[in-house]
């Protein structure tokens, strides 16, 4: 049987062929056009209804569900637990790749690699000006309030510093224009100090003066000495380009300016919490969310034994571990567990030995490597001590970059040298392992993080 199907003519989603309506017994051409227009309107309304329904489904089952899950976790916590947002450098890396036309180079290099060849030369100009940003940075954004009127601020939760600072209404630099500003005149609990101070970070400097006021984190409030920042020019362009207002330091007192106790220690000093410790839990399934708990340990965030490693430094959350990758070994290496690093940083010599014969591609001018996601040669990191063994498989240090090319991954491993061989165990490590930062016992606790709560 010969069945012929007539293909209708569509333009911009609307039916325009009159033959579509030939089956209707209508003689009046004006009525025919009215009906045709009615069908077009009906089509638009139907399309809008479907799209609205789809949007609502995504909102209800993805965004809202994630918020509900977070609220449920916070509500059922035994200790002060706050949710925070995670922003890392991967988007900036991909933007740089596209802006400077490295995408084709990477794809071509992969094709060479698949053919058993190696592409060693970058074909661009040696004068190509690529803006080098700090690709290893990652930012954990948490919210807190200052003043008895609870002026809201978004803070970087930084284990590498120990002071708390907020931008002041007295700030005159451009970076403060888009920030929440602290106004001491609106708080009845404000105490004047006025001591001038300058804070230095890897990304730059800020300056201002000390003040004291009520600081609220979650449901806990305490009088606390902090810095009102009035000049952020030395912190540009980082400050203007980021969404945080200030920094909440979670490091050690000896790192602080003005010999101020870290806020977690001060909470214990004022009998607000039982233990001077905090923990980080980063869900594997959600790269943009994390949980900070202060004063105690939420056992539902981890499974198996919780192993403690003693600190070997009085400034940093630094421990001693033996590092193994295949037959490459570095005994008694310093390992800093850091909430502000998006990668695993490795001594350069160690990294170069590790990458030999692994079929990876160095991206020109940028401190990272690309490979095929299914590369079976990629090794597992092993960090060991007398107390425990901590492994990091490729699935944890690989970052998919499908928009550069199908099946491509970036290694979240960066070569970085210190005077003494040191590893920084950043985001990849902290996603596999639940971490405890214990001031009281001067140690870091490590346990396997639960994948599903």
Curated annotation (Swiss-Prot):
The enzyme's E.C. designation: 3.4.23.39
Active-site residue numbers: 158, 338
Activity regulation text: Inhibited by pepstatin A. Inhibited by KNI derived compounds (KNI-10742, 10743, 10395, 10333, and 10343).
Entry keyword annotation includes rRNA-binding: no
Catalytic activity: Hydrolysis of the bonds linking certain hydrophobic residues in hemoglobin or globin. Also cleaves small molecules substrates such as Ala-Leu-Glu-Arg-Thr-Phe-|-Phe(NO2)-Ser-Phe-Pro-Thr
BP terms from Gene Ontology: hemoglobin catabolic process; proteolysis
Membrane topology of this protein: Single-pass type II membrane protein
Regions that span the bilayer: 38-58
Disulfide bonds: 171-176, 373-409
PANTHER family noted in UniProt: BETA-SITE APP-CLEAVING ENZYME, ISOFORM A-RELATED
Family: Belongs to the peptidase A1 family.
Function: During the asexual blood stage, participates in initial cleavage of native host hemoglobin (Hb) resulting in Hb denaturation. May cleave preferentially denatured hemoglobin that has been cleaved by PMI. Digestion of host Hb is an essential step which provides the parasite with amino acids for protein synthesis, and regulates osmolarity.
Name this polypeptide is given: Plasmepsin II
